[in-house]
Amino acid sequence: MRITWIGAALASALALLAGPLYALQPPATLALACSGPFAKNSSHLKLAMFFDSKNITFTDIKYADGSKVPASVLFPNDQKRRLEVWWSNPTARSNIHLIVIGGQSTWAAPGGLRLGQTLEQVEKLNHKPFKLKGFDEDRIATGSDWDGGALATVAGGCKLGISLRADAKASAEKIDALSVDEEYSSLDPAIRAAKPTVSEIVIGY
């Protein structure tokens, strides 16, 4: 009886070992690092092996201007866990070019960046103020310089970029006064008055 139990337990253990690493080691939080499955030399196959092939697809990402970018998408049917991975070699689906956190995704980027964070929260992660461009026609401002802060250097050799959307209550007049062609400090009173929050995070190699 004991031998039978041990045999069954061993069979179960071997079955687990044959499964994807994500199933064996599910992350406590969806935290992204520029290493492991998200290292520069990763591939669609490596992501499929880590997260399970049923949780990834390769498709064209469509943008409002009509352009398309071929990319691997993790958890395509789960807006909270969705993650886009663009490849330097799209044909081979290898060597990461960009990782995009957008929409309603709850992934945390290196350094603790998350969607929805305020200027003050990003400054705290950076350990100092940073610079950003003014707002475009969609009320989006783009981070332009971490100014030597903590987010300027990330382990693994990747770079962090963010976009911030102005608060819906910020007046069009105040937003238009902050030119997209100009660079501002995150401490600028006019920028802070717009109360922008992080709307997209890009991790690039």
Placement of each model-derived feature along the sequence:
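Bacterial N-terminal signal peptides
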Residues: 7-19
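Short helix/turn-capping signatures at newly exposed starts of structured segments
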Residues: 19-205
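Positively charged n-region of N-terminal signal peptides that target proteins for export
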Residues: 1-5
